[in-house]
């Protein structure tokens, strides 16, 4: 059910779950979830092939950035457990834990780059990632290993890779 219904803004997903924000505000519900999530974030694992693709792309001299709808504080905490920060030129999260603001964050990021948006490749796992890539004029590849089902991702028209190893093979064969 989750993969077929999760969406941004996250508040809309909470409404699909049946939350009544008249009875309890989204600020309270969202904060309760994040507090519980952060207590277990050290348990999060990287997807199989994550290190290999980060290493390979870096070996090509291609700059990598990580942009997330997660808050910068949350992102820093999660990444501290994986020792992958050195692969990224920039690591950017939002200024809140409600997943608001990734589009504005991305616009600001792209304006600061010395690249044309057409030279940027977004790799994500949500429809929102594809929407943001479209907004800034970049290509986007999607991997159905996150919050959204493959069927929903296919509807975006973006190329779909089943996993990071498949994406790595694409890079190696280009």
Language model regions located:
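Short, acidic loop-to-helix structural element flanking the phosphoryl-transfer center
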Residues: 38-66, 72, 76, 103
């Amino acid at each position: 059910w989750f993969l077929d219904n999760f969406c941004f803004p996250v508040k809309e997903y909470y409404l699909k779950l049946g939350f009544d924000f008249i009875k309890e505000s989204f600020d309270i519900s969202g904060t309760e979830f994040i507090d519980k999530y952060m207590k277990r974030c050290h348990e999060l694992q990287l997807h199989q092939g994550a290190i290999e693709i980060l290493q390979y792309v870096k070996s090509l001299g291609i700059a990598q950035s990580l942009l997330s709808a997660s808050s910068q504080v949350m992102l820093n905490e999660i990444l501290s457990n994986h020792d992958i920060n050195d692969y990224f030129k920039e690591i950017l999260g939002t200024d809140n834990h409600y997943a608001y603001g990734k589009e504005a964050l991305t616009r600001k990021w792209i304006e600061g780059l010395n690249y044309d948006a057409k030279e940027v490749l977004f790799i994500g796992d949500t429809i929102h990632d594809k929407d943001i890539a479209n907004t800034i004029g970049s290509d986007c590849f999607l991997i159905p290993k996150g919050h959204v089902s493959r069927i929903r991702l296919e509807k975006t028209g973006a190329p779909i890779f089943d996993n990071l190893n498949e994406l790595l093979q694409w890079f190696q064969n280009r």
